[in-house]
């Protein structure tokens, strides 16, 4: 594949990301997974990836509710046990991040020959190939071009999500681990997305 011409989206210092995690990981370092089982993971497992959102709703829809079947169910629900088992990691940006912007008009088709269905597919061959390619791109001085990927949310359109490469770790800070039930935006998520909390 020819070297793609992908625009960069610069995320300034001071931005705050959100990542939904298991409460059992409270206080641990940020984890950049190398399972090869997520959308922009490296298929060769050479680098790790951390998936974050800019808001709680997108972070939840891309994690806890990523395989929902709401169109087939009369009620949208989550158990109290599940709520209590989750926390939100507030992640601060210490230095500007350069993200490969796959949300820019025409980029998916012109640079990678992909449509939205392929980008959002649960078969990750295309997106993992793109991640590996973007990870290796460098500037003329040899510096890495991108710290991660900005891409359309599959489950919370038209929001965008971020896949951060592990080399971005030094530009990030774990600000706080917040119990999901205590998050300031949790009540509005339940209301806006019509989700009920079941007692069991």
For each predicted feature, which ranges?
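Extended catalytic/binding region for NAD+/ADP-ribose chemistry, centered on the ART fold
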Residues: 40-71
């Amino acid at each position: 594949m020819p070297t793609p011409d992908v625009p960069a989206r610069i995320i300034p210092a001071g931005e705050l990301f959100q990542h939904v995690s298991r409460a059992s990981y409270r206080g641990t370092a940020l984890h950049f997974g190398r399972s090869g089982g997520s959308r922009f993971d490296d298929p060769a497992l050479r680098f790790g990836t951390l998936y974050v959102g800019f808001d709680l709703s997108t972070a939840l829809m891309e994690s806890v509710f990523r395989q929902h079947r709401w169109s087939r169910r009369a009620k949208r629900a989550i158990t109290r046990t599940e709520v209590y088992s989750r926390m939100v990691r507030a992640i601060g940006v210490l230095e500007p991040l350069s993200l490969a912007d796959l949300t820019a008009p025409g980029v998916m088709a012109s640079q990678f020959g992909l449509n939205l269905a392929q980008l959002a597919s649960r078969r990750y061959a295309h997106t993992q190939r793109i991640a590996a390619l973007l990870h290796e791109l460098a500037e003329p001085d040899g510096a890495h071009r991108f710290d991660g990927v900005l891409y359309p949310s599959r489950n919370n359109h038209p929001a965008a999500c971020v896949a951060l490469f592990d080399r971005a770790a030094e530009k990030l800070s774990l600000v706080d681990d917040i119990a999901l039930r205590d998050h300031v935006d949790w009540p509005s998520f339940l209301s806006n997305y019509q989700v009920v909390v079941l007692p069991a």
